[in-house]
Amino acid sequence: MYRALTRDIEVTVEPYYLEEQSDPDDSRYVWGYRIVISNHSEIAVRLMTRYWHITDENGQVDEVSGPGVIGEQPLLNPGDTYEYSSGCPLDTPSGVMFGHYSMEAEDGETFNVAIPAFSLDSPGLVRTLN
């Protein structure tokens, strides 16, 4: 599990390999990830946009951005938690993702909340140190 805390907004990520959707013989590797966003602050915030920086093991970078998450722009009141799941396909057996959410506070202030970097590793992947 991976965690980041920005201005009392906690983001927790739990990635998992989706073997049934992956096809290594066709260079298709798919991961799901579960995200929990917890508002530990004293003000309400709305998740407005997302930004992802995805890098595969060959260094190929894909950047993804857009409004909300899974079609929603959730409002998190103080003490609220919001959970969602999504996925990421890669052409390589491993990679890494990180990013941020743009949040809008109830007073109109906007700020970014970090999504922690997390690894996408296929089961049985052997790593060697040089």
From Swiss-Prot:
What are the transmembrane regions? none
What Gene3D superfamilies would the database entry show? ApaG domain
Q: Name one Pfam family in it.
A: DUF525
Q: Which residues form the ApaG domain?
A: 3-127
Q: InterPro entries, alphabetically?
A: ApaG_domain, ApaG_sf, Uncharacterised_ApaG
A Gene Ontology biological process noted in the UniProt record is: error-free translesion synthesis
Coiled-coil region(s): none
Name the SUPFAM superfamilies for this protein: ApaG-like
NCBIfam families, per the entry? PRK05461.1
Please give the name of this protein. Answer: Protein ApaG
UniProt organism field: Sinorhizobium fredii (strain NBRC 101917 / NGR234)
Give the gene name: apaG
